[in-house]
Amino acid sequence: RLPIMKKMKNKYFLTISTCIFGLCLFLASGCSFISVSLVPPVEPLKETTVMGKGKEKVLIIEISGIISEEEKRGLAGISGEPDMVARIKEELKTAAKDKHLKAVILRINSPGGTVTASDMIYHEIEQFKKKTGNKVIACIMDLGASGGYYVAVSADKIVAHPTTVTGSIGVIMLNLSVEGLLQKIGVKDTSIKTGEHKDMGSPLKTMTEEERKIFQGILDNMYERFLSVIAENRKELTNEKLKSLADGRIYTARQALDYGLIDQIGYLDEAIELAKNEAGLTTARVIIYHRPGSYKNNIYSQLSNSSFSTINLLNIDLKTFVRSGTPSFMYLWAP
């Protein structure tokens, strides 16, 4: 029994000695702190062939969920992959360097998003087309409304699934007023400001008629921008016809085709064939860019498993875009 106790005692002292030695090393290093990242660094894009064969390529770019510059957040709010605008810019930049890439398909499933993010993606696609001369085809899946349609008109041709919902051409400002609620619980806004309209749009007060007119002027300007982008790319639409369509309503694929908002009703594989034809290709590999570690094996593979969860409009209104209390200008279908 004594030898066993002696061994245990030696083990105990060894453990204590190791801890003390480690502490001494830590103190000797000048109390340096070791930084440990909970999130692995974002790795460069990887190319995967999901269909076809040959040297020439057609790239599918996914535009799914709310269009914004907000980074996707993972567990405990930790930032995950880059925001949609940054990711699409990265994909287009990679595609522009590939001499074998001849066409791009925008696989759109979005109710829209912020005015600026929608316009930035539109601009990046336009710049890509000018730089490379490559054809771009938009294929709208379930939803391509408002900002989703804004992005789609950057394409040379727009294909919509038979069950697509599109349209919702217009601008909305998401804003809440909690003044009445605060009065009931005895809370009063005592903000100090330097100008009469400095706090316009604040949820802590009721919007005045003059403030409403100011906001309406801004929205009208953004609405005109939306119309000009459509008119520039859908030249068969007269100004009169376009304004009659752009009252915020949504359209089925059949209605959109009849009104000239899209070019064709079809499926994603038909959009791929159209892209090949537009690029003058008989055979081509269909590719997807993605981060290492994610499995992609067909043309419907998504970049993120959470893409559809971001189309929760209640979550948008109350969490993402109004959480700061400031108004948000949106090209968004938000019933």
Predicted regions and their residues:
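N-terminal organellar transit peptides
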Residues: 6-138, 143-144, 155-161, 173-335
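Short gly/pro/ser/thr-enriched loop/turn and capping motifs at secondary-structure boundaries
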Residues: 145-146, 165-169
